[in-house]
């Protein structure tokens, strides 16, 4: 086992990364190794998908399967060995079909196919022990003693960044948003990673390509969500329980939430969002369901306590899942799509009757708690509608600075930095937030500036697209570069979606971003220095020091 993809990975003087019997996330060594083997096989699929396009063959299932299966290897998504093996075998099958099609097409055209990496032809073993033995050749740090540490760091940066983009591609696909051009670029990069390049410059260029790719993916996902559910609008949301039977929907999948709401109509069940599903309550389409009563709980890392206390059924539509046996609720949590946990019921298709039956069999909430309202829904359209008022308040001096404070949440005590930072921002500034990092401060009162709320909840982590669009609009109004705006980005990271959003911002030329609470363990000091020199990327220090530096206070 070697895994170094998330913020909570082991860090020691002897080296970084989880490389023992179990990772910090609870992932067993065998599961980690099987995920590495799956990624290896997916690189082989992409290698042939690239060849197929070069030969003029039509797109295949690989365009959707590879990103989806890649998503399954994201932090806190799938811990089920059998499901991972199933994905790997399907990858082998798809690859073999593509290989045959390409070979036949090349023969007809009189073209000689160049050799491809081993992942394009290796045959999987028939047993789990054989697969685990094969996985030794798929470790992400394979050959680390023979190549420069910066090259290894760049490989991992690209791998984890592309993994984040794959997750957003799958979210978009669920909403019937796909692009042949995006799929082609994804396969190109995936196939390139399969060559194990030692060219640092080429790897750095590909990292920026991944950022550019993800910007297009986020735009596609934004289109999918708004086409299906309307544009989010400022909305008051209750964060306290309501009396009655209950279902909790966590993850990111709005389509699953819609299906659950339709199937629970008239059944006396209240539905709650959790974690990154909170923004759903701001979409017009969901407001037709009175039994969508609010948001329960907070960010992913608190689920073992929150789910244990939730007296109903829970559905995990995507990341993040952690061991449900700790809180003894494994018998009433259900997984969907790419999510998996051994022994937990996995739902295929669109029938949620098992969830409904479980919810009806449970006690539910016995009484209403006193309502506590928070405001959400300041996504792209709402921000653009508010832009004239924002511009006027900037011009008259009422608004002097913008802060984007958000990203991933996590366990570490150091993450209290983001709570303290938000609380310390001056009263003449606006705070934009997104992702589950918002839970560090989204129930606090920040007041308003001439009717404009100081705290503007943009939405899910992928709604960084909305923040980018606002920054572009403001830069056009003020006729300046984005980096000349009074805008500072302070981002918390945990996993691979955050990595690709960072790459997206860097690829767009956004500079002077602060990230925390710690730098990615897979990045070397030298590479961090390159990112600082080229983009002004900095790690968070203390709230006082960072705010003083941002606001040029001596």
From Swiss-Prot:
Keywords assigned? 2Fe-2S, Cytoplasm, Iron, Iron-sulfur, Metal-binding, Oxidoreductase
PANTHER family to which the protein is assigned, alphabetical: HYDROXYLAMINE REDUCTASE (PTHR30109:SF0)
Q: Where in the cell is it found?
A: Cytoplasm
Q: Does the keyword Protein biosynthesis apply?
A: no
Q: Which HAMAP family match?
A: Hydroxylam_reduct (MF_00069)
Q: What does this protein do?
A: Catalyzes the reduction of hydroxylamine to form NH(3) and H(2)O.
Which InterPro entries does the record match to this protein?
A: HCP/CODH (IPR004137), Hydroxylam_reduct (IPR010048), Prismane-like_a/b-sand (IPR016099), Prismane-like_sf (IPR011254), Prismane_a-bundle (IPR016100)
Name of the protein in its database record = Hydroxylamine reductase
Sequence similarity: Belongs to the HCP family.
Q: Which residues bind hybrid [4Fe-2O-2S] cluster?
A: 252, 276, 320, 408, 436, 461, 495, 497
Gene Ontology MF terms in the entry = 2 iron, 2 sulfur cluster binding; hydroxylamine reductase activity; metal ion binding; peroxidase activity
Q: Enzyme group, top EC level? A: oxidoreductase
Q: Which NCBIfam families match?
A: hybrid_clust, PRK05290.1
Q: Which organism is it from?
A: Shewanella amazonensis (strain ATCC BAA-1098 / SB2B)
Q: Does the keyword Transmembrane apply?
A: no
Positions bound to [2Fe-2S] cluster: 3, 6, 18, 25
Q: Which cofactors must be present for this protein to function? A: [2Fe-2S] cluster; hybrid [4Fe-2O-2S] cluster
Q: Which GO terms describe its biological process?
A: response to hydrogen peroxide
Write down the chemical reaction(s) this protein catalyses. Answer: A + NH4(+) + H2O = hydroxylamine + AH2 + H(+)
EC number, UniProt record: 1.7.99.1
């Amino acid at each position: 086992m070697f895994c170094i993809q998330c913020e909570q990975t082991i860090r020691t003087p002897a080296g970084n990364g989880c490389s023992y019997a179990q990772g910090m996330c609870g992932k067993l060594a065998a599961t980690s190794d099987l995920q590495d083997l799956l990624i290896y096989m997916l690189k082989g699929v992409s290698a042939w998908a690239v060849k197929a396009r070069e030969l003029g063959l039509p797109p295949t299932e690989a365009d959707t399967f590879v990103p989806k299966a890649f998503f399954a290897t994201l932090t806190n998504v799938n811990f089920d060995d059998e499901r991972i093996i199933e994905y790997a075998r399907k990858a082998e099958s798809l690859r073999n079909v593509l290989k045959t099609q390409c070979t036949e097409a090349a023969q007809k055209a009189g073209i000689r196919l160049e050799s491809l990496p081993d992942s394009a032809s290796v045959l999987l073993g028939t047993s789990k022990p054989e697969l685990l033995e094969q996985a030794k050749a798929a470790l992400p740090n394979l050959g680390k003693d023979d190549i420069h540490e910066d090259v290894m760091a760049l490989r991992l940066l690209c791998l984890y960044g592309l993994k984040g983009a794959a997750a957003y591609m799958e979210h978009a696909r669920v909403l019937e948003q796909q692009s042949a051009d995006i799929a082609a670029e994804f396969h190109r990069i995936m196939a390139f990673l399969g060559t194990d390049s030692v060219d640092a410059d080429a790897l750095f260029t590909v990292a920026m390509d991944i950022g550019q790719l993800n910007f297009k993916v986020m735009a596609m996902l934004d289109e999918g969500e708004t086409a299906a559910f309307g544009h989010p609008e400022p909305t008051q949301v209750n964060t306290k329980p309501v009396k009655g039977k209950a279902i909790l929907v966590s993850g990111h999948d709005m389509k699953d939430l819609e299906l659950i709401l339709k199937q629970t109509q008239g059944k006396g069940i209240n539905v709650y969002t959790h974690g990154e599903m909170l923004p759903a309550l701001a979409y017009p389409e969901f407001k037709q369901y009175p039994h969508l009563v609010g948001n329960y709980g907070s960010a992913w890392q608190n689920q073992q306590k929150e789910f244990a206390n939730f007296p109903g059924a829970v559905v995990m539509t995507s990341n993040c899942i952690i061991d449900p046996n700790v809180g003894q609720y494994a018998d009433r949590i259900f997984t969907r799509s790419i999510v998996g946990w051994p022994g937990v019921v996995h739902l295929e298709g669109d029938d949620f009757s098992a969830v409904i039956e479980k919810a009806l069999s449970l006690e539910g909430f016995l009484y209403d708690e006193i309502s506590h309202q928070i405001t959400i829904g300041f996504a792209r359209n709402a921000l653009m509608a508010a832009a004239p008022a924002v511009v006027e308040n900037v011009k008259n001096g009422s608004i002097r600075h913008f802060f984007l404070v958000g990203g991933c949440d996590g366990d570490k005590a150091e993450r209290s930095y983001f709570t303290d930072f938000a609380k310390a921002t001056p009263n003449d500034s606006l705070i934009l937030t997104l992702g589950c990092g918002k839970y560090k401060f989204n129930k606090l009162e920040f007041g308003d500036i001439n009717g404009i709320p100081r705290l503007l909840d943009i939405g899910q982590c992928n709604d960084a697209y909305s923040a980018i669009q606002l920054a572009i609009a403001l830069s056009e109004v003020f006729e300046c570069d984005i980096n000349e705006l009074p805008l500072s980005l302070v981002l918390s990271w945990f996993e691979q979606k955050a990595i690709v959003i960072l790459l997206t911002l860097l690829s767009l030329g956004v500079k002077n971003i602060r990230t925390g609470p710690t730098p990615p363990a897979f990045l070397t000091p030298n590479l961090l220095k390159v990112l600082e020199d080229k983009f002004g990327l900095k790690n968070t220090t203390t709230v006082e020091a960072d705010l003083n530096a941002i606001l040029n206070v001596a």
